């Protein structure tokens, strides 16, 4: 999943231009890089005319092999801003095996000062770009860049999108033959929308023939600069003599899109993220929150930890966490550092032999700029407090004030926050969903998104989802002169964060039985014991043992989790009709019945984030919007399906328990 080299290895010529050491090739023409990009990719795909012809609310999807320095993307974005109507949107999806480091990207793009107004916002958001799918939102969501970091033949088969124009870039076929294969071109054809176009800088005969065989009609056209000819073409359709692509499974299909109005039930991280992603796409959103303010339950802690609990084996959950971490980390760039969040890093202590072994596996699987091992003296120096163990350090992690993130997300002008609205019943009337609290109708819209954690089980459509509540309590301790030295979040079984507004947060307990949210002295004592295991030195610096337990401040809330620890994100189906429609799967799970899924039209969910909501909820808002808008998914298809609500009904059918 992770490239052997985390970043491109570059040499720079005497004019400051980058050259790849791995492929021994240049990133762009030394004489006319911009002119060449515009001629080969912009003009051959007729992007000026096509952007100008877009309607308000319409989107255009460009796919690219080889992001490189981002020059093609920036030129496309510049033209889109010049030609497209204000309400149109651009999706740019690009695969890159060896992404440039932020410093190298900044150095390379400095060569093009005329693109500075586009490269500057890209560079601001070019943080935490690691393996897999990485979504970067620009211009308030009008332009979305999704980078697929890794080998093209591993990433593109996982892409779910319909591409209107392909930029076939990458290094020259002779230098990088893996990017110019029949297998890769078949993926481009699978992803091509009807009428899709394609262009590339090479005019090599065998490349043209392979693209023709994949379903594109290619022709040579005059080049520019030192390139005599280039190739352009159109997608004619899947070739008749080629094996058909695997049939789409209807239970993971996309429901039809209707009117762009939505009710979001629940004003925590999941609800605010869902509302923000839809509002950025032109939706009118009503965000219903039963409390007086947003983020009053599990999303209301003063500090949450931006911490990646990864697997070395590339599981669906690990891929979700890696993509979600990057997305949230980029969103935090919009907030006030020090008060709303701090990228102080996270240190996970190797507190026993099993944890030390797990950390060693992770350090071998992931690049050092994501995580790296520190021995005990290094860890102690990094943390600024006495520690008994070394551990794994995540330099881009840190702490977040979740209510600040929620409030920023909900501040979009197309979002109306309706406080003191507790939805007790949903009714479907004349293709609209109505939210009721008894005798009073609170609001109505074409789409409802259930984002109220486990409380959504009160609604019949989501009552069978296996969501469970786990009580957690945090403790707040006043900062002291001695505790100011804590320089990073430190975790073992629990966590402690550097102070925010004069208070440290530590926690959090796990109670699977209690349904009472009154903070208890017993759990404060448990949190202090977890702090002792992290650092007895910090416990002493805080004077925590001298504080009466009944004087400690804190709060309790319910986490909401699923049995497989993945969130539940996507459209909801009618449970009984689903079991009847796909009953045959109980006899043969391999078949794909050609029967449409019995969707509950306009009913969606974003829930089950457990203790990872800071990392998974914001990107799940994007995933939900992609399902609704028929856009490129922000996650690998297998991960999106692993998060789909229908996964539980499918498992019951296949096991014969429906």
UniProtKB/Swiss-Prot annotation:
One of its GO terms (biological process) is methylation. GO terms for cellular component: cytoplasm. Pfam families: DAO (PF01266), Methyltransf_30 (PF05430). Residues 265-658 are annotated as: FAD-dependent cmnm(5)s(2)U34 oxidoreductase. Keywords: Cytoplasm, FAD, Flavoprotein, Methyltransferase, Multifunctional enzyme, Oxidoreductase, S-adenosyl-L-methionine, Transferase, tRNA processing. GO terms for molecular function: flavin adenine dinucleotide binding; oxidoreductase activity, acting on the CH-NH group of donors; tRNA (5-methylaminomethyl-2-thiouridylate)(34)-methyltransferase activity. SUPFAM superfamilies: FAD/NAD(P)-binding domain, S-adenosyl-L-methionine-dependent methyltransferases. Residues 1-236 are annotated as: tRNA (mnm(5)s(2)U34)-methyltransferase. Transmembrane segments: none annotated. This is tRNA 5-methylaminomethyl-2-thiouridine biosynthesis bifunctional protein MnmC. It comes from Pseudomonas fluorescens (strain ATCC BAA-477 / NRRL B-23932 / Pf-5). Its EC number is 2.1.1.61, 1.5.-.-. It catalyses: 5-aminomethyl-2-thiouridine(34) in tRNA + S-adenosyl-L-methionine = 5-methylaminomethyl-2-thiouridine(34) in tRNA + S-adenosyl-L-homocysteine + H(+). It is found in: Cytoplasm. InterPro entries: FAD-dep_OxRdtase, FAD/NAD-bd_sf, MnmC-like_methylTransf, SAM-dependent_MTases_sf, tRNA_MAMT_biosynth_bifunc_MnmC, tRNA_MNMC2, tRNA_S-uridine_synth_MnmC_C. Its cofactor is FAD. The keyword Cytoplasm applies.
